[in-house]
C-alpha cells in the first residue's frame, strides 16, 4: 500500500488541527517501543482507495482492517480524494434516527440511521449540501450501527490515506 499526502485547504483551521494531531501522533510513534508501535498501527484507522471496474472508491477501515464505511464509485481519483476530505469535514454531524416514529429532522451534515429492506440497521453520512458521502454495512442491532457511527467519528479525522495496490 502506498501512502498519499492529501491536504486540501477547505478551511485553514481544520488543516491546522489535522496537522497538530498528525505531529502529536508521529512524535508519540517515534518514541514508542516496537510493540507499542504495533499497537498504535493496529488502532489507527485509514482510508483505503481502491480501483473498481467502473472507477475508484474508498473504504474507511478501523485499525483492525474492518470496513466501517464505503463511498460511492467516483470516475476520477481526485474526486475520490475530495470525498475523503468531505468525510473528514462532515463526520462531526449529529445523528438522525429514522427508525423512530416521528423522528426529529437534523440539519446537514448528519448521519442518518435507517433500516433496509431486509430489516438491518444502516447509516449514511450526508454532507452539508445533502449529498451522501459514505454508507455503512448492515448491522443486526441499532446499538452496533450507532457504534459504527462513533468509529467513523473517531477514525476519519486523522486516518491516513493509502492506495490498495492489489486492486490497481
Language model region names:
Residues 68-75, 95-102, 133-140, 161-167:
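Short, tandemly repeated low-complexity microdomains enriched for cysteine and small residues
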Residues 61, 81, 155-161, 165:
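Mobile acidic interaction elements
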Residues 46-52, 57-74, 83-87, 110-116, ...:
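A structural feature that tracks compact, well-ordered secondary-structure segments
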Residues 16, 20-31, 36:
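Short, positively charged and aromatic/hydrophobic N-terminal segments
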Residues 41-53, 89-117, 159-168:
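Intrinsic disorder/low-complexity detector
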Residues 4-8, 29, 42:
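Aromatic (phenylalanine/tyrosine) cluster motif
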Residues 78:
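Glycine/alanine-rich phosphate-binding loops at beta-alpha junctions
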Amino acid at each position: 500500500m502506498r501512502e498519499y499526502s492529501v491536504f486540501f485547504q477547505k478551511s485553514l483551521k481544520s488543516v491546522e488541527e489535522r496537522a497538530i494531531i498528525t505531529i502529536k501522533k508521529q512524535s508519540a510513534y517515534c518514541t514508542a517501543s516496537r510493540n507499542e508501535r504495533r499497537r498504535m498501527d493496529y488502532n489507527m484507522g485509514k482510508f483505503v482507495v481502491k480501483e473498481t471496474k467502473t472507477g475508484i472508491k474508498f473504504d474507511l477501515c478501523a485499525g483492525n482492517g474492518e470496513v466501517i464505511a464505503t463511498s460511492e464509485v467516483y470516475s476520477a481519483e481526485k474526486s475520490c480524494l475530495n470525498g475523503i476530505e468531505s468525510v473528514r469535514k462532515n463526520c462531526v454531524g449529529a445523528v438522525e434516527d429514522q427508525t423512530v416514529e416521528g423522528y426529529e429532522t437534523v440539519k446537514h451534515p448528519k448521519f442518518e440511521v435507517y433500516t433496509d429492506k431486509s430489516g438491518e440497521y444502516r447509516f449514511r453520512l450526508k454532507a452539508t449540501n445533502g449529498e451522501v458521502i459514505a454508507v455503512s454495512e448492515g448491522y443486526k442491532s441499532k446499538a452496533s450501527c450507532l457504534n459504527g457511527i462513533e468509529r467513523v467519528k473517531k477514525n476519519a479525522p486523522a486516518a491516513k490515506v493509502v492506495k490498495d495496490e492489489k486492486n490497481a
